[in-house]
């Protein structure tokens, strides 16, 4: 008991002495010397470190990023090579197309006469080729008609030597009408409407008429006897047939774009390209063919004493109902 009491008293004295001692207690950690490279961290430094944002997670190491780049490099280079090859292929195809187009245009220009190819640009060459083809078409019609005319004339001279002079004068004109009429494709009945086709033809004893309509562009071909084709007739007070026809078409809101005439003996082929204006009341092929047929009928039947276009005994401003009923 005595030993226990002494030990307890000694422990109490030790605690009291340590509590009342002016020098603080130093732990074993405090007593150890600090290394030179260590940095003493203050409370402010700890608070700053705690307030900083944490580093982004899942950040791959540099070695992994390098490996991915090495994997993607061949694929990126392959795509660039394909794009470059495709671009070069397109350039080569376009260059080849332009070269072929220039060759064709140069050949086309060399085949045309000088009046039809006065400029070297593409639009002028193509437009000149169109005009030249139209001129060749009219020349072909004239030559075919002349050929049949000469053949029929030779047959009539060799087969019969006892024909009357009147018959010999009428025969040369009949082959022209037959040979020229073969270029007008379709027969047309004015009492019936051709709703399915885009081409109609009117055939009467005095003329053959063919009309083709493509959207707002109309092509009109007329085979008719010429009136006023001699200088003596042109000098008279009666205007020519062509001027009347042009005036009548313009009065129907058909703007003339191109007009050409091919003649043989006293027959003429009028090839007219016209634009159908918005104010035109003739909306179909049959309407245009009927109106032109009506005009030519009135021109053929009009008296010879008319001295000007204002004195013509008919009105050119025909509407759709008048044209239909007049036929």
Curated annotation (Swiss-Prot):
GO terms for cellular component: nucleus. It is found in: Nucleus. Pfam families: HLH. Residues 77-88 have a biased composition (Basic and acidic residues). One of its GO terms (biological process) is regulation of DNA-templated transcription. One of its GO terms (molecular function) is DNA-binding transcription factor activity. InterPro entries: bHLH_dom, HLH_DNA-bd_sf. The keyword Ion transport does not apply. Keywords: Developmental protein, DNA-binding, Nucleus, Transcription, Transcription regulation. PANTHER family: MAX DIMERIZATION, MAD (PTHR11969), TRANSCRIPTION FACTOR BHLH71 (PTHR11969:SF86). Homodimer. Interacts with FAMA. Transcription factor. May be involved in the differentiation of stomatal guard cells. This is Transcription factor bHLH71. It comes from Arabidopsis thaliana (Mouse-ear cress). The gene is BHLH71.
């Amino acid at each position: 008991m005595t030993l226990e009491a002494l030990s307890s008293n000694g422990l109490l004295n030790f605690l009291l002495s340590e509590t009342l001692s002016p020098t603080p207690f130093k732990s074993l950690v405090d007593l150890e010397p600090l290394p030179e490279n260590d940095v003493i961290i203050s409370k402010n430094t700890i608070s700053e470190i705690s307030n900083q944002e944490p580093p982004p997670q899942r950040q791959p190491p540099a070695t992994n990023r390098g490996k991915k780049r090495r994997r993607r490099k061949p694929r990126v280079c392959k795509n660039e090579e394909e794009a470059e090859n495709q671009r070069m292929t397109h350039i080569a195809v376009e260059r080849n197309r332009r070269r072929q187009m220039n060759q064709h245009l140069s050949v086309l220009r060399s085949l045309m006469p000088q009046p039809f190819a006065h400029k070297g640009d593409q639009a002028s060459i193509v437009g000149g080729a169109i005009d030249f083809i139209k001129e060749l078409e009219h020349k072909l019609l004239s030559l075919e008609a002349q050929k049949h005319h000469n053949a029929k004339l030779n047959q009539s001279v060799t087969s019969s030597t006892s024909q009357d002079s009147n018959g010999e004068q009428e025969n040369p004109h009949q082959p022209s009408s037959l040979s020229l009429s073969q270029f007008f494709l379709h027969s047309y009945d004015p009492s019936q409407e051709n709703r399915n086709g885009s081409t109609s033809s009117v055939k009467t004893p005095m003329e053959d008429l063919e009309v083709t309509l493509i959207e707002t562009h109309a092509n009109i071909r007329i085979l008719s006897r010429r009136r006023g084709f001699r200088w003596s007739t042109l000098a008279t007070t009666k205007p020519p047939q062509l001027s009347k026809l042009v005036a009548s078409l313009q009065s129907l809101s058909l703007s003339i774009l191109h007009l050409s005439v091919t003649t043989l003996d006293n027959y003429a082929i009028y090839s007219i390209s016209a634009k159908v204006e918005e104010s035109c009341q003739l909306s179909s092929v049959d309407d245009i063919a009927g109106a032109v047929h009506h005009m030519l009928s009135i021109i053929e039947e009009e008296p010879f004493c008319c001295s000007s276009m204002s004195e013509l005994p008919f009105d050119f401003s025909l509407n759709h109902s008048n044209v239909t009923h007049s036929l």
